[in-house]
């Protein structure tokens, strides 16, 4: 469950929409519409936000462990993507044993013309023709690890999402969504 620092971010979002702060998401003795709404949206929104950008605070560099006895579907090698913390998105890939990294957004999106596919991902397994793989990836980190700008954007986005449910105000939700988008651009 979320850390105390994470509860602070959740409460900042709740207060933004006129709701009372909560002490915990773990209270199982009474059913609270606020806690239910937060639980329904929290993890989805956090993971979506983390995947949306290459955040410094969520980027991890690692060498992948090669797997054996795995169907490589025509590729030479198979590697397990990180599980703890979970790899949400591979953002950079090294073809030279970690000496230099290729930014995948630049490689696939910003250069004109067809590009060689460097790897494929199937069920949390990275398939490629590189003998030793190093990646930089966006990890599913705890909210307490967010830097200040990302935390601020998250609070605004959570408030916007919750505004549709808790005060049930489309107008407030639309305003908060615009505010969240501005904060996201700054982050």
Spans of model-derived segments:
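Glycine-enriched, solvent-exposed interface loops adjoining structured elements
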Residues: 1-187
